[in-house]
Every structure is written in C-alpha cells, then in structure tokens.
Amino acid sequence: MFVPDPLRAAVSDEAWLAAMLDAERALAEVTGDEEAAAACHPELYDVERLCEEGRADANPVVPLARALRERAPGAHRGATSQDILDTAAMLVARNARELVLAELDGAAAAAASLAEQHRSTPMAARTLLQQAAPTTFGLKAAGWLVGLVDARRRLAGARLPAQLGGPVGTMDPELTSRFAAALGLEEPVVPWHVHRGPVAELGAALDAAAAACAKVGLDVVLLAQTEVGEVSEAESGGSSSMPHKRNPAAAVLARACARIVHANAGLLTAGDYEHERAAGAWQAEWPALSAALAFAGGAAAAARRSLEGLEVHADRMQANIAVEALPGEGAATAEALVDRALAHYREST
C-alpha cells in the first residue's frame, strides 16, 4: 500500500543477496579468482536459509561466505563481512535511488505545471493556520517545486563508495581502487567501517526528500478540508462509514511514508561507532536503509499522484480571501517569484 512494487523489489532480501554476490564477484575478479567469480550467482543460494543462519552470527555474510567456499575455496579472500555488506548497501541504494529520483522528478513536473498554470490565481496565505494576506496558488506550488528540486539534487549527489578494508581496515588501497571501479562505485579515501559519513549523508538526503513530499501532502490535506475546499484530489479516497467523504488519500500517504523515513533516518545518521567495528549500531543500519529508501520512494510517488490529479478550485480560493484583493505590486512580485522557481526547475532538468 505504501511503497510501489519496483521499490519493494529493489530493497528486498533477494536484492540484498544479489548485491552481496555482486560484491563477492567483483572481489573475485580483481583478485583473479575465476572459480569464485563463477560461484556468485543468486539462483545458487537460498535467501531464506541465509537469513535464518545469519541470526547465529548477527550477519548474513558469514553463512554466505561459507556457502561460497563450498563451491570455490578461494572466495571472500581478504575481505571482512562488513566489506561485503557495506558495498552491497551502496549497490542496493544506487538501484533504489534511481526509482526514488524518478518519482521526485514526476512530482516536480506536476508542481511546475501547477505553478505555471496558476501563476496569477489569487488565494489567501495562512500563517499559524490563520489567514494572513493574499498570495497566489502559483507561488504556493512554486514553493513545493523548489523543495522537491533541491531535495532531488541533494539525493542525487549523495556519495556511494565501495568498502574494502579487510578485517581491521588495512587492505591494500590499490585493490580497493580496482574493486570500486569494477562495481562503478566511488573509491573511498580510507575504509569507512566506523566512519559512517556515506550512510549518514544518504539517510539525511532521503529524509530531506521525504520532508519535501510531506510538505506537499500536508498543504493539500489542509486545503482540501471541507471548510476550506480550495483543492481536491481527482482520485479521492473514501470512507468505510461515511460515503459522502472525499479524502485526499495520496496526500495522506505522502505524509505517512515521510514519517516512516524520519523514524529510520535517526538510525542512519547516529554515527558514533566504537573502535574498528560497531556492535549493534552497524547492524541496525540494514533494515533502516531499506525502509528509508522504500518509504522515501513511497512518499514521492504519493506526492506525485496527489499533484498530478490535483483539482484547483480558484473560485473557492477567491471567495475565501478575507481581506482586500491582492494589490498590483504584490501580484507582480508573486508572479516573478513563480518565474524564478520555474527557471530553477528548468536548470535542474
């Protein structure tokens, strides 16, 4: 209900297994172990069994490495479990991020269309939930647009480095360089086993993206209230007990997904890990990262649906304005700000 199917698949246990095996294959290739590389096919392994066996070690790479060595004794040579899991996390994030970015692009395009279409549509601005002074709906949509564009840019720029430090971070950096290149990931300056900047950066970027979507959702929910009635979603949700209701369901989902991202972002941005390997904090990242990626995409997809089908009731906006009509100077300023937002959007596409 919350997350689009492609995103669910992108962060599934099967996706993590495939990513771990991609990391193992790249390690085998850069060390010249063809037998180990040939053993790195997901269909050869039972993901449910690996998850179950991984509980005993608090780590799914331990049983995976054991299974790999049954087929190729040289597999996993020189690496530690965290090398494989951190690299897999970056691969999972890379694939899922593309899906999140696509949904953000769709939401931004819809916001841009609304901003342009309603550049001069007057409405009441509200501060502390009270009417303040007139503005335009185009400017409100322009604010959504800039928030989405800037969040998208931040997420797209988040670093995704490979990890190959060996048991205590002393692996040959030349090998790490070739390993990263084989996977198309960034080469780290030093191993980041307990220096979690990349994970924190990704978590913060996903959180910001979710917040931009939640802002859209909250504004739509408030504007769609019966007593306000200034917008409505084309595909409104219903009620099990009150058939007359038209609930802004997509906006509600955008807010719900964003809250789940916020809850998981704290686990990704904590950062205070002990010595050369964290006991518990690192392990907590895995489900938190999957959830943050999935629900950030869910928030963006819901915001996109809400905006693409948003019905704007300009007559109700005009009727709700409790003060004199927007003076010419104010209208011109609002329109100019809309144009600035649209230019910012076009520069980003």
Residue ranges and their predicted role:
Residues 89-102, 109, 116, 123, ...:
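Charged, flexible cofactor/metal-binding loops and thiol motifs
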Residues 305-327:
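Generic long, charged, amphipathic alpha-helical segments
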Residues 84, 260, 321-323:
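Weak global preference for isoleucine
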